[in-house]
C-alpha cells in the first residue's frame, strides 16, 4: 500500500534544506550594499567567538581601564615634570613679588626735600644752601612782623599762683598800666601786703620777662616799645630768685641802643 501524499491546501512552500539556505545567503552577499571604492571587495568578517578576551578598541570608542593604566613614555613624563617645575617656579616668583611689595609698603617714607634754588647757569651747592636759608629766615621775619601788627598775647605766671593768665601787650601804653593790670589779676597771692606794687617795693616779688633769645630780664630796663616787641613771657618771681637779672638786662639794653 503506498504512503499517503501530503497535499498543500493552504499554499505553504515546501521546506528548504540547509544547503539551499547557504546558497541563498551567498547570492545575497553578492548583491549586498557595502562601503568602498568601485571594484573593491571588503573582506568578510566572521562573528567573534564568545571568549573572555578583551575586545579590540574600536575607532572613536572610549578607552578602557587597561588603556588608561598604561605607563607614559619617557618623553611625555619628562614634559610633564618640566611643566610642574615651571608652575612651581612661577608660584615662587609670585610669592617673592608679594614679599617685595610688602617690604616697600612697610618702609618709612623719605623726608620731604628741602627748598632748593634752581637757576641757570647752574648754581653751586653751598650757594643753594645759603639762598635757601636766607629765604627761610625772611619768611620767619615776615611772620613775626605780621604777628607784631596784630594782637600780642603773652603768658603771665606768678610764683605760688596755681594758674596762668594771658595779657595783650598792645593794649597797654607803658609799664605802669601793665603793673596795675597784673596787680588786679593776681591780687590775694601777696600775703600780708596791700597789693603787688607794695610787694614789689619791698623786694618780695619782682616782675621779669623772657625775650626772643630766651634770656630772663627785669621789666622796666628797656624802652616800652622794645619790651613789647621782644617779650615772649612774663613771670612774677620772688626777689631772691631774681638776683643777677638786673645787670644782664642793663648790659643787653646798652648793646641794643
From Swiss-Prot:
Biased composition (Low complexity): 105-118
Principal location listed in the UniProt entry: nucleus
Domain PB1, residue spans: 151-239
Tissue: Highly expressed in etiolated seedlings and flowers. Expressed in roots and green seedlings.
Pfam families assigned to the protein according to its UniProt record, in alphabetical order: AUX_IAA (PF02309)
One GO term of the biological process aspect: response to auxin
Induction: By auxin.
Superkingdom: Eukaryota
Keyword annotations of the record: Auxin signaling pathway, Nucleus, Repressor, Transcription, Transcription regulation
InterPro entries in alphabetical order: AUX/IAA_dom (IPR033389), AUX_IAA (IPR003311), PB1-like (IPR053793)
Keyword Repressor: yes
Region annotation (Disordered) ranges: 1-51, 85-119
Motif (EAR-like (transcriptional repression)): 33-37
UniProt GO cellular component terms: nucleus
UniProt xrefs under Gene3D superfamilies: Phosphatidylinositol 3-kinase Catalytic Subunit, Chain A, domain 1
Compartment annotation: Nucleus
Membership in a protein family: Belongs to the Aux/IAA family.
Subunit structure: Homodimers and heterodimers.
Function: Aux/IAA proteins are short-lived transcriptional factors that function as repressors of early auxin response genes at low auxin concentrations.
Protein name per UniProt: Auxin-responsive protein IAA17
Lineage, top ranks: Eukaryota, Viridiplantae, Streptophyta, Embryophyta, Tracheophyta
Gene that encodes the chain: IAA17
